[in-house]
A protein has these predicted regions:
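Basic- and hydrophobic-enriched, low-structure N-terminal and domain-boundary segments
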Residues: 1-78, 82-90, 95-97, 134, ...
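P-loop NTPase motor domains
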Residues: 51-57, 61-393, 408-411, 478-483, ...
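Residue-level detector of alpha-helical secondary structure
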Residues: 256, 557-560, 567, 571-578, ...
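Conserved ATP-driven motor cores of ASCE-family P-loop NTPases powering translocation/secretion/packaging/pilus
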Residues: 385-387, 391-487
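Short edge beta-strands and adjacent turn/loop segments
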Residues: 579-595
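Acidic, low-complexity, intrinsically disordered interaction modules
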Residues: 592-613
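Conserved short beta-strand edge segments in small beta-sheet-based binding/regulatory domains
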Residues: 618-628
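C-terminal edge-of-domain segments
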Residues: 630-639
């Protein structure tokens, strides 16, 4: 007797009892889509969201306005631009409720196909174009820092000029608040530039390079306040050139000597002292890391685009605006600029949202970030995806694979991003990504038919049995074989399976790009501030007493008298040290801060210096200098909390 057995798995065509026993995964039905999402007429869209579904004539679209952000997963050739970005721009530009857009556009394709459509529909169209810098708008990435520091200078000046004591206190507090915000902005920018993918094994070098950048930005601002440089000299390229010039031994000593004249409590002094006093080998290693991160600002195209600003950083929240950032995708160095620009604009827009009554931007914003995982990590991305929606901002992150996202942010942070976003699957060539999508879809329960047959010379018996088994809704291999299809995972309901649709199918799309003004690229060397330009005599010329009114001169003199009390204890201590020796005591003022200067022909012993330092170091910054043959002691009161 011969026995044959055949097992036949089938998708059941009739109702299966206990149909969820091994899994209940399925795709969303049209009735569920119609219930969960808002239907709009393509020609008359009221509020744009993510396009979940279309009718067969592409005249109606169902929008998802609930999912806060989206991650698009598509390898090269998946049609991200023509089936996702351009259609979304068509809906966005034509919607009655206007939103702004920030679009990274590596090839310039999005600009070429959508810019005229945006302009014709009332949008301000801006470009930051590193491919064609002669056609680009300008964006000095230090602009928010400069503006905040100028507020500090303005309020400080007002605190001197006004006679009302209550107002003096008010302006002084505003000045200190702006100074603190300036320092926060400096730290944030330096972190964006110096941050590595994931976390470096030895963060010392990156942290030190960041500290060097913070100090140099602070130094340029202080020189601007003193009147030693002009506003247009405060650029990242100028800072890069200054650091290059300081590598010359003679220049380094000159810079170090000049820095010694600055007071503790200044950004430059506090940040640079520990860096430039490091050992020679350590300092060279720090500047090597600094140079590798800052080298992109040597690029003539980058220097021209970032030499000034011709629009406000928060314009996207004030009026319907589309900003295209066009970067050469063949050179990943430029992607650093995308991260910096996104980080800066996002921070300024959050500040704008926070002063609105409802804490939301008047014109809400979609960030369409192509090649997101090719960019260096965006600082505080976890916080961004958690709170951006409440400020009126929605992010669209385009990546090629999950592994690419993990490589940039690490698995933990990458998971936080994914947990806060809907997912759009377009195409993958990697098995790991296909397996992850299959896992997300889950398993369904299907019937499995088993057929047994026995045959002999005299008899034939047949037997068929049916059982239930689990099956992937789509297997990894099936997912990899999909063409012109997409799988959408919104935060509401089951996943959605539909065709990808070209932008030309939609009646709201209008082709064309705008003509941009062509400017001449410049040799900007005349704007660079380098070590050779330092003039020691200029270091304290802001608000020179001789240039102030009599009332303000009197105010400064009164302040000096009041501040003497701050130094009473150390003054008395040093009087005991020098009780049998003639010495001179002077109270001086620099940048509206009083310090105690002591000079004596008697040099202090190492023991005296140690005793003074250990006794008063918590309250004062103390500098000892005897290089001139005199003992000079400069004592600065520590401003606690600043």
């Amino acid at each position: 007797m011969v026995v044959f057995k055949y097992i036949e798995p089938l998708f059941s065509k009739h109702k299966i009892k206990n149909s969820n026993e091994y899994g209940s995964a399925r795709f969303s039905t049209f009735n569920e889509i119609n219930k969960n999402f808002k239907k709009e007429e393509v020609r008359r869209i009221n509020q744009v969201g993510f396009p979940i579904w279309f009718d067969k004539d592409y005249k109606k679209v169902w929008m998802d306005n609930e999912t806060p952000h989206w991650v698009y997963l598509g390898s090269t050739g998946s049609g991200k631009s023509v089936t996702q970005v351009i259609p979304f721009c068509s809906f966005l530009s034509s919607a009655e409720l206007k939103r702004s857009a920030f679009i990274t556009d590596p090839k310039g394709e999005i600009f070429n196909t959508t810019s005229k459509m945006f302009q014709d529909r009332g949008y301000e169209v801006l470009t930051i174009d590193f491919r064609n810098p002669e056609k680009s708008n300008k964006l000095n990435i230090l602009e928010p820092i400069i503006k905040e520091y100028e507020k500090h200078i303005l309020y400080e000046k007002k605190s001197l000029e006004i006679q009302n004591k209550k107002k003096k206190v008010e302006y002084n507090n505003k000045s200190m608040s702006s100074l603190a915000e300036t320092n926060r902005l400096i730290s944030s920018l330096a972190d964006m530039i110096m941050k590595d993918k994931v976390e470096a094994k030895d963060p010392f070098w990156n942290n030190s390079a960041r500290q060097l950048l913070e100090g140099l930005i602070g130094f340029f601002l202080e020189e601007y306040k003193l009147g030693n440089i002009n506003r247009n000299q405060i650029t990242m390229t100028s800072i890069r050139k200054f650091q290059n010039s300081s590598m010359d031994e003679k220049n380094f000593e000159k810079f170090k000597s000049y820095l010694d004249t600055k007071k503790y409590g200044s950004k430059s002094k506090d940040s640079l002292t520990s860096v430039i006093t490091a050992s020679e080998n350590t300092y060279k290693s720090i500047t090597s890391v600094f140079g590798s991160k800052m080298s992109l600002f040597d690029d003539v195209n980058v220097a021209n685009v970032t030499s000034s600003s011709d629009f406000d950083f928060d314009i996207l929240g004030k009026k319907p605006t589309v900003l295209y950032v066009i970067v050469p995708d063949e050179d990943k160095t430029y992607f650093t600029l995308v991260t910096i620009i996104v980080g800066l604009l996002y921070r300024e827009l959050v500040k704008l949202a926070n002063i609105q009554e409802n804490k939301k931007l008047t014109y809400q914003i979609d960030w369409l970030l192509d090649e997101f995982a090719n960019c260096p990590p965006l600082v505080d991305i976890e916080a961004i995806v958690s709170v951006a929606r409440s400020r009126g901002m929605r992010f669209h992150f385009f990546i090629q694979s999950f592994a690419q996202l993990n490589n940039v942010y690490g698995k933990d942070v990458a998971q936080i991003i994914l947990d806060n976003c809907g997912l759009v699957y377009l195409k993958t060539n990697t098995q790991d990504t296909a397996e992850e999508i299959s896992k997300r879809l889950g398993k369904q329960t299907i019937e499995s038919n088993s057929i047994s047959q026995s045959v002999s010379l005299t008899d034939y018996n047949g037997n068929k049995s049916t059982s239930l088994m689990a099956r992937d809704l789509l297997t990894p291999d099936e997912i990899k074989q999909l063409h012109y299809k997409m799988i959408i995972f919104p935060i509401i309901g089951y996943p959605i399976f539909r065709d990808t649709i070209l932008y030309t199918k939609f009646s709201c799309y209008k082709k064309g790009n705008i003509n941009r003004k062509i400017d001449s690229l410049k040799d900007l060397s005349y704007t660079y501030f380098i070590v050779e330009d330092i003039n020691h005599e200029n270091k304290s010329k802001d608000y020179n007493k001789e240039n102030l009114s009599k009332e303000n001169q009197q105010f400064i003199n009164e302040k000096l008298e009041q501040d003497k009390l701050l130094f009473e204890d150390i003054d008395n201590y040093i009087a005991e040290v020098y009780k049998d020796v003639v010495y001179e005591t002077n109270y001086k003022e620099v940048n509206f801060q009083t310090y105690l200067n002591i000079e004596s022909p008697k040099l202090l012993s190492n023991e005296d210096i140690l005793n003074i330092s250990s006794t008063f170091s918590e309250k004062y910054y103390i500098e000892f200098d005897n290089s001139s043959g005199l003992q000079i002691i400069n004592i600065h009161f520590k401003m606690l909390g600043l």
